[in-house]
């Protein structure tokens, strides 16, 4: 008879243990997914932001010059200077962004947490 009285306590303990285990696994996956989502959103934000910034800088650069200076510069600077500068700046931005991406991936190292 005393064995039957201990069954509810045993069931409660096993339920508590299973609940704690499920909560730990859910917390682990939730934090991992949140960290990955944060890293992806930061990476995409850097790419989109720097790309838009470079395009706006290069388009504003040509519209700021007075007409006399613009015609004088057109004799020296080739017609495809803006795309060339855009390619150079995009490469520098890409190197910076991928460096930041490596740092973010280093932050997301699973062995640290």
From Swiss-Prot:
Entry keyword set: Host membrane, Membrane, Transmembrane, Transmembrane helix, Viral penetration into host cytoplasm, Viral penetration into host cytoplasm via pilus retraction, Virion, Virus entry into host cell
Q: Does the keyword ATP-binding apply?
A: no
Where does the record place it?
Virion; Host membrane
Which Pfam families does the UniProt record give?
DUF5455
Look up the signal peptide feature and give its range. none
Superkingdom of the source? Answer: Viruses
Q: How does it sit in the membrane?
A: Multi-pass membrane protein
Described by its record, this protein's role is as follows: Plays essential roles both in the entry of the viral genome into the bacterial host and in budding process. The formation of the G3P-G6P complex termed adsorption complex is essential for correct termination of filamentous phage assembly.
Can you quote a single GO CC term? host cell membrane
Return one Gene Ontology term, BP aspect. symbiont entry into host cell
- Lineage, opening ranks: Viruses, Monodnaviria, Loebvirae, Hofneiviricota, Faserviricetes
Please tell me where this protein is predominantly located: virion
Q: Which family does it belong to?
A: Belongs to the inovirus G6P protein family.
What sections of the protein cross the membrane? 13-33, 36-56, 69-89
Q: What is this protein called?
A: Head virion protein G6P
Supply the InterPro entries for this chain: DUF5455 (IPR035210)
How does the annotation summarize its subunit structure? Interacts with G3P; this interaction is required for proper integration of G3P and G6P into the virion.
């Amino acid at each position: 008879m005393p064995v039957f009285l201990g069954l509810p306590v045993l069931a409660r303990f096993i339920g508590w243990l299973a609940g704690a285990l499920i909560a730990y696994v859910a917390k682990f996956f939730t934090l991992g997914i949140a960290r990955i989502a944060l890293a992806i959103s930061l990476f995409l934000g850097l790419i989109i932001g720097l790309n838009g910034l470079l395009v706006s800088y290069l388009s504003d650069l040509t519209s700021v010059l007075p007409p006399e200076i613009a015609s004088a510069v057109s004799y020296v600077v080739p017609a495809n200077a803006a795309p060339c500068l855009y390619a150079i700046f995009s490469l520098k931005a890409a190197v910076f962004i991928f460096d930041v991406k490596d740092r973010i991936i280093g932050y997301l190292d699973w062995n640290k947490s």
